[in-house]
Design a protein with these regions (language model features):
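Conserved beta-strand signature within the Rossmann-like core of class I S-adenosyl-L-methionine
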Residues: 166-170
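Accessory, often C-terminal, charged low-complexity segments
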Residues: 1-79, 97, 113-117, 155-159, ...
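Conserved P-loop NTPase mechanochemical-coupling segment
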Residues: 84-100
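Phosphate/oxyanion-binding active-site loops and adjacent basic polyanion-contact surfaces
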Residues: 101-105, 143-151, 381-389, 441, ...
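Conserved RecA-like ASCE ATPase "motif II neighborhood" in helicase/translocase motors
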Residues: 101-118
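Mobile active-site "lid"/loop adjacent to the S-adenosyl-L-methionine
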Residues: 121, 128-150, 165, 175-176
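Conserved proline-anchored active-site loop of SAM-dependent methyltransferases
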Residues: 118-133, 184, 405-419
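Active-site-adjacent "gating/activation" loops or surface patches in catalytic cores
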Residues: 90-92, 104, 120-133, 347-385
Length: 509
């Protein structure tokens, strides 16, 4: 049995709106914290005006009051300050929206099982692909058996954390897709496979000497039980890509062509007779009048551009009433008259489709570039996923605005970024748990989350909108490493006592 790993360091990142102002005098004297704010948030560029206070040296309490989305990191403060601050926050467990764990993920999963057993709503992971194309900490080019062993141990352990209705989604490429498919079927069962999505993540294609240039990856989705299902993606009627309109009563509708297309739209039966929904609609271009009973100058039949007879989406007996209510109209499209109607529906969501070609799924354009703009450096982390694609996966896994999402191959922290973005968009209270073993935990993963909490938009490492921050508490901990165990690490007494107290009492809070 693997030896228990101890929590060797525990800290919190807390937005100032959640910090009692009695701590402000101590905060403005903390040079390490202020230096981080200058480097991370460029607070020295904040200028004052008639109503606001700008940056100054020394920093003022009023400046803190007016910039309450700044994130305090307890690692810059004494053990005494940390204890007093944490003790002053009511309902710390409920208010903590994120947990970051610097650890080998198998040990972290075992530790998480103490508090989160059967309570995680969704797991999203982007593990090593076991190919030369994914350069990450785990040694790629494993033999199949070694890679499968790595994955089986972690996926099996993480299943204990999923709630009954929970889902797990895994990003993978062609190289290990067949083996992963077999593994997931063995762990979750064939009947709990809810679909596989093909995502265009590299529109330019992957350089190759002999093979087809791959532009895609996959996301495999499995449910934890028969009660698991894919959620519909929310539809925002104000999003112009959906073409929703407001009627005169302020109700959203979608303009839809009355002529049906696709499955079950053929008007002719096998014997050559026509279905009842193949009928003429009469139209007067001058008055705009539409009727099925009164013959008018123009006769419109549901015949498509290829001359195929289709059917209307509505029966003949309701058309005149719909016109009287202002729900039917005709417009000329490319020289032909088309009949449209107001569709009052669809806002309950849309089904997730198996192919994603959205430009926002591009890892280079919407993964790497976004991360570079946040961190202000190029290529500090290779091949990060696009937040949009991860957000889609999260929404498909859970429609709960207080869902708990786990990623135990956290990498650059895209999953945490996606959760924060979703909460910012719909005022949700989702929580994220990220596990990462790499040293870039402190140079990429943690800084990224701290920056995304502060602002939604970044360019060249600087915030572009200081008013887009979210109120938040995030906790990050480090577990004892295998090397620490071998070395029989000894902590400074004060730090050891604090780590034991906070790491035990508040470990997963």
């Amino acid at each position: 049995m693997a030896e228990k790993k101890f929590v060797v360091d525990t800290n919190w990142c807390i937005t100032l709106d959640k910090v009692d102002e009695k701590f402000y005098p101590e905060i403005i004297k903390n040079e390490a914290q202020i230096a981080e704010w200058r480097e991370m948030y460029a607070i020295h560029e904040i200028e004052g005006n008639l109503t606001t206070v700008g940056y100054s040296e020394p920093l003022t309490i009023e400046f803190l009051r007016q910039n309450k989305n700044l994130i305090l990191d307890t690692r810059h403060f004494s053990a005494d300050f940390k204890e007093r601050l944490i003790a002053s926050i009511d309902n710390l467990d409920e208010q903590t929206g994120g947990l970051l764990i610097h650890s080998e993920n198998f040990q972290a999963l075992r530790l998480l099982n103490k508090k989160y057993k059967e309570s995680i709503d969704g797991i999203y992971i982007d593990p090593p692909f076991n190919s030369t194309y994914s350069e990450i900490l785990y040694k790629n080019n494993y033999k199949h058996s070694a890679w499968l062993s790595l994955m089986q141990d972690r996926i099996s352990q993480s299943r204990f954390l999923l709630c009954r209705e929970g889902l797990i989604t895994i990003a993978i490429d062609d190289y290990e897709m067949p083996k992963l498919w077999e593994l997931m079927n063995n762990i979750f069962g064939y009947d709990n496979h809810l679909g596989t999505v093909t995502i265009r993540v590299n529109p330019k294609g992957r350089m190759t000497a002999r093979k087809i240039s791959a532009v895609h990856e996959y996301t495999i989705v499995f449910g934890n039980s028969e009660y698991s299902y894919i959620k519909k993606l929310p539809v925002n009627p104000e999003d112009k890509t959906h073409n929703y309109k407001l009627d005169e009563n302020g109700v959203w509708y979608l303009p839809v062509n009355l002529r049906k297309q696709g499955v079950d739209s053929e008007a002719e039966r096998a014997d050559g007779t026509l279905l009842d929904r193949y009928y003429p609609i009469y139209y007067d271009p001058k008055s705009g009048l539409v009727s099925t009973k009164r013959k008018l100058p123009v006769t419109i039949l549901p015949i498509d551009n290829n001359g195929h007879k289709r059917i209307w989406r509505r029966s003949k007996d309701v058309i005149d009433d719909m016109y009287a209510r202002g729900e039917i109209w005709v417009k000329e499209v490319k020289g032909e008259y088309q009949v449209y109607f107001k569709f009052y529906g669809g806002l309950d969501g849309k089904m997730l489709q198996s192919i994603w070609v959205d430009p926002e799924c591009s890892a280079s354009d919407y993964g790497t570039k976004i991360l570079n703009n946040i961190l202000g450096e190029r290529e500090r982390f290779l091949y990060p996923k696009a937040p949009f694609a991860v957000k889609q996966n999260i929404l498909a896994m859970s429609d709960k605005r207080n869902a708990v999402i786990l990623d135990y191959f956290a990498g650059s922290g895209t999953t945490g970024h996606a959760v924060l973005d979703l909460n910012r968009e719909d005022s949700g209270n989702r929580k994220y748990i990220l596990v990462e073993m790499g040293e870039y935990f402190y140079t990429v993963t943690l800084p990224r989350i701290k920056k995304v909490i502060y602002s939604a938009d970044w360019k060249n490492g600087k915030p572009q909108n200081r008013n887009s921050g979210v109120s938040h508490i995030m906790k990050y901990i480090s577990l004892e490493s295998y090397e620490d165990t071998l070395s029989n690490i000894e902590l400074d007494d004060d730090k050891h006592q604090l780590a034991m107290k906070l790491g035990d009492e508040y470990m997963i809070h």
